């Protein structure tokens, strides 16, 4: 597994390489290697996406993953530099728990989740991965959780109540 730093492109989207895997196919003449790359991309203001790319060469796999990440971005409502509420989500046997944190806490999370929060613009969060720590499953579980994020305004509108009643 390899890691790379955050790269910012001209359009302001940050990209971070989370994992690179090597696979081998055994053929008559020996082994043929392939690579898969997992990349997260975000604008630093609540938009984030992830992509998986596969190719025979590492740079090609990273390029494909980056394109997929940019194509599949979601918008997550943030509360300043943290989350609105605690979230628990599961994908396969990876369960992630994300909690909002007070100012100055920083990003306390595992490698795969840390990359997501950094490119998304979250600066204060507590996150824990329970069960499998497979980076692909952790990223998918994190995205499932982030899709569940709701603002107090949207919760109040769904319940037909005033925001003051919800925030209590």
From Swiss-Prot:
Keyword RNA-binding in the entry? The reply is yes
Q: What is known of its domains?
A: The N-terminal domain interacts with the head of the 30S subunit; the C-terminal domain interacts with the body and contacts protein S4. The interaction surface between S4 and S5 is involved in control of translational fidelity.
Q: What is the lineage of its organism?
A: Bacteria, Pseudomonadati, Pseudomonadota, Gammaproteobacteria, Legionellales
Q: What does this protein do?
A: With S4 and S12 plays an important role in translational accuracy.
Which residues does the UniProt record annotate as the domain S5 DRBM? Answer: 13-76
Q: Name one GO biological process term.
A: translation
Keyword terms = Ribonucleoprotein, Ribosomal protein, RNA-binding, rRNA-binding
**What protein am I looking at?**
Small ribosomal subunit protein uS5
| Family listed | Belongs to the universal ribosomal protein uS5 family.
Matching NCBIfam families: rpsE_bact
- One GO MF term, please? rRNA binding
* Source organism (scientific name): Coxiella burnetii (strain RSA 493 / Nine Mile phase I)
Superkingdom assignment: Bacteria
Q: Does the keyword Nucleus apply?
A: no
Q: Which PANTHER family match?
A: MITOCHONDRIAL RIBOSOMAL PROTEIN S5 (PTHR48277:SF1)
